UniProtKB/Swiss-Prot annotation:
Key words, A-Z: Cytoplasm, Methyltransferase, rRNA processing, S-adenosyl-L-methionine, Transferase
Record-linked InterPro entries: Alpha/beta_knot_MTases, RlmH-like, tRNA_m1G_MTases_N
Protein name: Ribosomal RNA large subunit methyltransferase H
Keyword Metal-binding appears in the UniProt entry: no
Protein's organism: Campylobacter jejuni subsp. jejuni serotype O:2 (strain ATCC 700819 / NCTC 11168)
Subcellular location: Cytoplasm
SUPFAM superfamilies: alpha/beta knot
Pfam families: SPOUT_MTase
Keyword Transferase: yes
UniProt-listed Enzyme Commission number(s): 2.1.1.177
Record function comment: Specifically methylates the pseudouridine at position 1915 (m3Psi1915) in 23S rRNA.
Any single GO CC term annotated in Swiss-Prot or TrEMBL for this entry: cytoplasm
Binding site for S-adenosyl-L-methionine: 75, 102, 121-126
Catalytic activity field: pseudouridine(1915) in 23S rRNA + S-adenosyl-L-methionine = N(3)-methylpseudouridine(1915) in 23S rRNA + S-adenosyl-L-homocysteine + H(+)
């Protein structure tokens, strides 16, 4: 299968406790798309997070701005709830997908509104490290749905 689709996941995290699980889904996704996972955590973000939520969110946005390309999706607890089938339809027929996972303070409302879509994986507040793993699984599931693979039953 030819991988014409580019999937980018941009996140802000110090460590990846779920690395083994994330790698499993990254490998499975590679059958359907080229996947890039980019952690943009830097010293400026670390300092801003120690100041306050406003400065932290500004630093996240500055780190993410150069990567706004393709169909851009913010992961946001206030975003739209989708079923796996609805998510599969959302990402179908796109050439490039860019997902943005905020840090400990989430993302600024203005940044979220500047993107193409806001997706909620849950109404619960989730650790951003876990969100990436959950997102990878749902991307893989969506590809399986769109390609009639039996993974999604």
């Amino acid at each position: 299968m030819e991988n014409n689709l580019q999937v980018n996941i941009f996140c802000i995290q110090k460590s990846d406790e779920f690395k083994t699980c994330s790698e499993k889904y990254s490998k499975l996704i590679s059958k359907y798309a080229t996947l890039k996972e980019i952690n943009v955590f830097n010293k400026k973000i670390a300092l801003a997070q120690n100041l306050n939520a406003i400065e932290a969110k500004k630093s996240y946005e500055e780190a993410f701005m150069p990567y706004k390309k393709g169909y851009c999706i913010a992961l946001d607890e206030k975003g739209k709830d989708l079923t796996s089938i609805e998510f599969a339809k959302l990402i179908q027929d796109k050439n490039e997908l860019s997902f943005f996972i905020g840090g400990a303070y989430g993302l600024r409302e203005e940044f979220n509104q500047s993107l193409d879509f806001r997706l909620s994986l849950s109404k619960l507040t989730l650790a951003h490290q876990f969100v990436k793993t959950l997102l990878l699984e749902q991307i893989y599931r969506a590809f399986c749905i769109n390609n009639n693979h039996p993974y999604h039953k």
